[in-house]
Amino acid sequence: MIYRWLLLVSCLLLALLAQRGAAKSSSPKIAPPTKIDHKPSSLFYFEDTDTVLMNTVNGDLLRSVDAGETWSVVEGDDGGMKHHVLLIRQHPYDNKKAYALGPNGRHWVTTDQAKTWASFNIAEFPAIRHYPLVFHGGDSSKVIFQGEECAGRYCIVRSYYTTDDFATVKLLRESTGGCAWAVGHPQFAEDLNLAEEIKDRSFCVVPGLKVPLPHANRLVYSDDYFRGNAEGTETKLQEGRPVSGVISTAAVKKFIVAAAKSKGTEELALYVTVDAKNWHRAEFDGHRIEEDAYTMLESTNYSLQVDVLTSPRSGMGVLFTSNSNGTYFTRNIEHTNRNSEGMVDFEKIAGIQGIVLVNTVQNPEEVESGSAKKKITSRISFDDGRTFQPLKSDGENLHLHSVTALRNIGRVFSSPAPGLVMGIGNTGNHLQEYAECNLYISDDAGVTWRRAIKHPHKYEFGDQGAVVIAVRDEGRVDKINYSLDHGKEWASVELQHKIYPTMVTTTPDSTSLKFIVVGSLKESQDGEHVIYSIDFDGLHERKCEEDDFEKWPARLDEHGKPDCLMGHKQFYMRRRANANCFVDEEFKDPQPIFEACKCTAEDFECEYRRTEDGKGCVIPSPLTPPEGECKKPDDKFMGPSGWRLIPGDACIRDGGENLDKEIERSCKDASSPSTDGKIRVTLQLLEARDYAQYYYLERQSSSSGSDETIIMLSSEHEVYVTHDHGKTWERPLKGEEITRVYLHPYSSDVAFLLTDGKEGFWTEDRGHTFKPFQAPAPPTQDRFLQVMAFHPVHKDRLIWTGAVDCHSGDCHSDAFIKKGRGKNWEPLLSYVQKCEFESRETRPNSTNLVYCEQFEKQSKNGRLQLLSSDDFFNDNEVQFVDVINYATMSEFIIVASRQPENPDSLVASTSVDGRTFARAQFPPNVQVPVQTAYTVLESSTHAVFLHVTASSTEGGEYGPIIKSNSNGTSYVLSISAVNRNSLGYVDFEKAQGLEGVAVVNVVSNVADVSKKVPKKLKTMITHNDGAQWMLLPPPTKDADGKSFGCSVVAGKGTDDCSLHLHGYTERKDERDTFASGSAIGLMMAVGNVGDHLAGGDEADTFITNDGGISWKSVKKGKYMWEYGDSGSVIVIVPESKPTKTIHYSLDEGDTWEEFQFSDVEVRINDISTVPSDTSKNFLLWARLSNSEVQDKFATFNIDFSGVRPRPCLLDENQGNSDDYYIWEPKHPFQENNCLFGHSEQYHRKKPSAQCWNDWRESHVHSIGTNCTCTRADYECDYNYEPQSDGSCALVPGLPKPDAMEICKKDPDTIEYWEPTGYRRIPQTTCQGGLNLDHFVSKPCPNKEEEYKQKHGISGVGLFFAIVTPLAVAGAAGYYAYSKWDGKFGQIRLGESAGTSQSFLSRDSWLVTVPIAIVAGTVAVARALPLLVTSLWRGASGFIRLGRGRGYSRPYASRGSFAARRGDYTSIVDDEDELLGVEDAELDEDDEA
């Protein structure tokens, strides 16, 4: 018995020993490889699982549930996923969800880690330029799907949303920049108790209310998926006001960042919020942020990291770190290395606060000059970027390849394995090529490094750093290297196949002992690939115990002791490098240990920003001292220091620094000397004799600076520059003779100063510095030709027109092109007159489109031909062979060429796409047999205004203005006999900022002008874009309160009594316009009241504040004027006579004050301010004579900034406020404020509000409503002309236009409409109402069947056509029956006296039956024809699905400006009759 027990025990011991021996193996286990036929495009693990998804380039989706050992193809329930997965996305905040997007509108979602997939349908291709999926940070069931439709640079994004994992999908809205959730990250607003308020909030970048171009984009939000308010609420990004030009938004941990860019600058404004409500503009310590020139980097929980491009040519930047609310950024390190895709060599060490690895450029000056390649060096910071130091290996500097040379998936250097960091690099002076580098490793978070293995490798960490693997990353390999002691000792294991490795990866938390290695069997990495699964589970026989771990400090200070960051030290319990065990805690992340520190200065930040010396904080606004303090300026009071403890900082206050305590401040700090109510004057006497021209470098709304820069060219050709609006002047190019100045029209910080030779100068920093440049030839000698042309998109792409062969007698102009900064000038075309870039955002595939006028046969005696090219004239196309000139305006190119059949006459042609031209069809009532000149006036409202010279007799020039349709080809007469001068300029001006308002001067005595009688001019105004014109109503009193010597009728101007204004042809400076784009509704002018425009000596000065409907006399005599602060201040000064005073108004011209700016009288040549009229500074250009100087050129700066104490407060949601009211432009003949089918609303400062607008851009508050159509929404069609009653009639003797022309142009068109004489104004958005352009539709030839199918009544329609009249008849009969009460005319005051029924009571059959029959018969007889007609007309065109022509979207979304011609249902006349509005309809017809 004892023997048996001994034998049993012995066997058990042997079995146990044998089992332990099997547990420890000498090498990792490699599963049989899996071969796939196509290259993987992406791969990811579901976090905390062994489940892996892999997408291949052929559209297959593979799944592994055992960390890559085995794989299966995911086919879906019906096999639809096979070969149809375009891309896969993992939910970043839910480890159970993933999404597979298909190319054909069918997509799939899994909520159980790819065990099952549910399909959903969205008929959109996933967005490429925007995120196709946007995830909610708080509710993983909420996802936004985005598809896009692009034409050139412009895209329409359609965003769909789900709140139930795509079980249901709804359209969120259309936009231009996509949509995003407010809660875009789990950390967003998590401590602010806003969960309920913002849980459903979404932001969308949508088109501007008026202009569908990027510079007008808006950021709107909705808390109900845009159901209650389809337009959404505009986000107040800057000081409680909306901002235009929003490009995109991004969620970065606890921040949301929005980027905006204005027209005319590349500078971006970044706005940041931490609560989705309050936004602030981020400041970058004086640095500019430009589009595609900043990168949002991996950020912390308490700050943003941004790298800003500073050198576009060479790819270098500056690294910035923000304060805790993301508003003020501090520069960390200069010359960071970037690539052309915006990737930055920057990475935070995973799991450890405050350690950052960056690469910088050692030789920035040489690289910038183009004389050397980058020398890249690596730097590391252990204090969150405050200081950086070199990486060290064996006493030498170490440099590592980083993000710009990414060779594997995942992070570059680190993983969640505490303290372990690896990289490919070399020691020495700078970084070498990748192939020359080795693998280095650090196990103390980058403090010290050692070489691990020679040659570059792909690498990965496992088991919290207990295992490190590396696969050589050059050529074919057949082995894997691994280390179990933090890279000190290495071993290897053979692979079955030789591969070119493409991926080495493991679980995201690096806690697994399993790895995946993917490689290609071909060097090209196309075709067949192999997947290996490597398992290290058997290499150690035991799991680590407590003694195998060490308490490892994550950060050390310069003395080698644990360092504090954000108020605490950080430690990890980490496996010792030599421990003979595995951690084997799969999917359990290492947990940091924190120990609090006492507060130091590093735990505080400035609430706004630091002082220049970095030792204190700037207080953003004047301090308010406590009540009773500051009785004297030299007194002191206790006020804020400007410091605050960084939010989230856990330092111990007791015994530590206390920078945020109040400090003693001088009462001088509490005063604001600039707002003392006074106007300030600064006189500057200049050495120049006079000015020849001056140029403002307008600062755009997204620009960060505040300078007001002017470049002035003196009469001696010397340049003067001021950055403070003339308070001080400097001469940066003293001694240089500058003959021309060109401002870059698409980049307002850039200007070019030319000489008469090849030498020139340019500035890109608003005149602070000027750099010389060499032109390929001297400027063209033709003073009427422009020397420089600029590309609208590529700001460094230029065309230069220069004089060539001028010493040989064959002086002509050649064009040269510079294709980018740093590029050389290249010849473009010889013997040219003008060359221009024709790239436009609304013109697809036009990036390289160039137009040039070239003399035929390269001879100045040849005809001038117009050429176009897409490849800089390697090839070209002749557009016209005999042109006079061409002009580009808005979306149109208009060409004037000679008629082949009559060379003495011109013909106009128009193109929208820049490829095809159509000959302009002039209206027959414009009889100009020999067309000698055109003037293109304006085309901002989707139509061209063209002046055709009818008389070119000297002193008697005039002609009609005609207006085009939306493609610029068919014209109608807008107004006749408009004044022109000998240079071709026309008395026509659009009121800036107001749709459809324009002013002209017409020649009223045309018959006499041909007899050499001087022209008599009358001023007329239109409020509906030239469809109707009226005389200007005069003021009731003149400036002295006296009546004018004439009278008006019903407040309207008459031929004998109206206001007439001196116009464009009489201006010294074309910039002196009536109106301002920022002072909406205000216009000023000089003129007189009477029967025609009198001479300048009889002129007075007038103002209107309602867009020209009513006018007021301001001053007797002629004055020059300028608007400031968007119209809240207006300054006028006498023209052409000595003065020492100006007059100004602070209430839109209601009252005027006088201000003396000089002790002696001076003669003012001009008054100016910034072109946007948003400054509080004005500049008087004068000639001064006093006891000290005689007739000296001088400037006076008049500064109003101290007059008012504060900026105005605006609440966009309320509209009206204490400082603002909502103003709507009106039409003098309409009561509903509708212009172009909608009413607009603007914020205007109340004249009584004592505050400043401080807004650089005029802002539409809203498009109030789309109105019903009226006569004002129509203009006369081709071959029709307006009559005296406002109607349109066919021109006598002319046929109606061929309505069937549309059928010939488009074979797919089913129907055409008989002409009515009217057409819709191109920009109107009206809906319903008066339908003047469509009455009768007819089928196109051979389209009768399709026409019947489209308009025929269905069985259901026929049923209702029969039943409805009968039902109406029955209802009418019952009504008569129920209301009859026995006697006609009976009035009952109480109950009937008796209860017996009379023969004629209402219940008597003698009454009920006849009445029912009669009423029914009458109702049927009346209703049936009307209803049948209504149904027929309704089916035959008043409800239309399309008109058989291409639908061009003139606006960016369906919601705003949706209406187009013929897209809306109208109520027909007979339906109006049924509704009882016959009389109203007749009245409206009479008016029409």
UniProtKB/Swiss-Prot annotation:
Enumerate the Lumenal topological stretches. Answer: 24-1351, 1427-1488
Q: Name one GO biological process term.
A: Golgi to vacuole transport
- Tell me which parts of the chain lie in the Cytoplasmic compartment: 1373-1405
Keywords (A to Z) from UniProt: Glycoprotein, Golgi apparatus, Membrane, Protein transport, Receptor, Repeat, Signal, Transmembrane, Transmembrane helix, Transport
Q: Where are the transmembrane segments?
A: 1352-1372, 1406-1426
BNR repeats sit at 63-72, 380-389, 440-450, 482-490, 720-730, 1102-1112, 1144-1153
> Which residues belong to the signal peptide in this entry?
1-23
Which Gene Ontology cellular-component terms appear in the entry? cytosol; Golgi apparatus; membrane
Q: How does it sit in the membrane?
A: Multi-pass membrane protein
Chief site of localization: Golgi
Q: Which residues are glycosylated?
A: 301, 325, 481, 845, 967, 1266
Q: Where in the cell is it found?
A: Golgi apparatus, trans-Golgi network membrane; Prevacuolar compartment membrane
Q: Which Gene3D superfamilies did the record assign?
A: 2.10.70.80, 3.30.60.270, YVTN repeat-like/Quinoprotein amine dehydrogenase
Q: What does this protein do?
A: Functions as a sorting receptor in the Golgi compartment required for the intracellular sorting and delivery of soluble vacuolar proteins, like carboxypeptidase Y (CPY) and proteinase A. Executes multiple rounds of sorting by cycling between the late Golgi and a prevacuolar endosome-like compartment.
The UniProt similarity line reads: Belongs to the VPS10-related sortilin family.
Q: This protein is called what?
A: Vacuolar protein sorting/targeting protein 10
